Amino acid sequence: MGSGWSSEEEERQPLLGPGLGPAPGAARRGREATAVLPAAGPNPGRVYGRRWLVLLLFSLLAFAQGLVWNTWGPIQNSARQAYGFSGWDIALLVLWGPIGFLPCFAFMWLLDKRGLRVTVLLTSFLMVLGTGLRCIPVSDLALKKRLIHGGQILNGLAGPTVMNAAPFLSTTWFSADERATATAIASMLSYLGGACAFLVGPLVVPAPNGTAPLLAAESSRAHIKDRIETVLYAEFGVVCLIFSATLAYFPPRPPLPPSVAAASQRLSYRRSFCRLLSNLRFLMIALAYAIPLGVFAGWSGVLDLILTPVHVSQVDAGWIGFWSIVGGCVVGIAMARFADFIRGMLKLILLLLFSGATLSSTWFTLTCLNSITHLPLTTVTLYASCILLGVFLNSSVPIFFELFVETVYPVPEGITCGVVTFLSNMFMGVLLFFVTFYHTELSWFNWCLPGSCLLSLLLILCFRESYDRLYLDVVVSV
């Protein structure tokens, strides 16, 4: 393990040399950002090759958390037959994800006070417990269902770290011209894990045959249960490997900071919340992120339920969900790399992405109402509209994260992103709560997509961007 910046107190102390400051006449935000500069210490700016290993381990953890969270939605028909799950159970299994964000602020405090290593180890340990709980062999179906729900709750508690810590990791380990890319990779891998659940589940677990005779149905139920347990054991093994790797090597931070922003002093936990809640610009852009991304996350979790009324099979629904998220991950990383090369364009990128998201979500919603709109309802149109929607929305996540941090700097990255992901999961949880009661007819859920995307587009248009952290790295360090 690399040597750390030795103590908690030292972590919050200035590390930059004297004489660094903004030119006379700089804007007020530039002066506020520069006020957090240290008074003495070595000049930072070194990056280490091990940063990619740290990013890989964190990304694999995020991938596994997304995979475990989305285990049940893509195989909901099979789970109903194997374990006697109801539509309420399936919605609740997905709902444990946003419920796991309720102690989000405790994880933000831990990340701010104890750093990456302690927080990541606790997160991975919770995932080991959760996936292990689902694998306990019991014959009582009622007890098995409780164990599965308990495992999903523990995995949901890992969500705050994998969703919030990406900008913190990128600032801690990466230089200014790599931060957006690192944030995109770390944050997108959780979505990619959820996408792989759409692929792995339906391919490994067979769909039930509702027309089979009674004896054949019992045999099919046992076979489906065995295949589901195979998936559960495989996920448990993957999580254990990742936990072992992070336990063996996951340094809290590099010996020297990679940039001026990484070395600068940050606001305290209490002052950070006061700054966030009093910043109207931050609240505006936070809602622009939380509402559509929360709606889309909940919609993706029950995509199979939504597509069943239009006669889309479990396997086809899985492929649609898979490619929509994979496309968003690829485009998101590409957009972040573009943002690293051409700085100060985050708002424009978001406007383009949400214009596309509004159009594609409207197309999908109207297509599902083909009896009224007479639009062609084919596999091609469903694939195209869902994939485009996933590409536009998922690829906006790392761009939003970078804009949040720039807007409220010097608030710590973990606290900033923790607040917005908490809001996103709150909206997701509210929608999934309604799904547990109104799961027989979900056309209303489809209309939430274009409405939330349009609202977000209007909020982004009214938002006035600023780049306080970038000012430190590009101007002050010159």
Swiss-Prot record:
Topology in membrane: Multi-pass membrane protein
Protein name: Solute carrier family 49 member 4
Organism for this UniProt entry: Mus musculus (Mouse)
Gene3D superfamilies for this protein: MFS general substrate transporter like domains
Family: Belongs to the major facilitator superfamily.
Keywords: Glycoprotein, Lysosome, Membrane, Transmembrane, Transmembrane helix, Transport
Post-translational modification: Cleaved in lysosomes by cathepsin L between Leu-214 and Ala-261, generating a N-glycosylated N-terminal and a non-glycosylated C-terminal fragment.
Subcellular location per the Swiss-Prot or TrEMBL entry: Lysosome membrane
Chain ranges on the Lumenal side, renumbered to this chain: 73-89, 139-152, 206-229, 303-314, 369-384, 436-442
One GO-annotated biological process of the protein: pyridoxine transport
Membrane-spanning parts: 52-72, 90-110, 118-138, 153-173, 185-205, 230-250, 282-302, 315-335, 348-368, 385-405, 415-435, 443-463
First-listed, main subcellular location of the protein, grouped into a coarse class: membrane
CC annotations in GO: lysosomal membrane
Glycan attachment sites: 209
Motif (Di-leucine motif): 15-16
Known function: Mediates H(+)-dependent pyridoxine transport.
Region (Disordered): 1-27
Catalytic activity: pyridoxine(out) + n H(+)(out) = pyridoxine(in) + n H(+)(in)
Highest taxon, organism lineage: Eukaryota
Segments on the Cytoplasmic face: 1-51, 111-117, 174-184, 251-281, 336-347, 406-414, 464-478
Annotated gene: Slc49a4
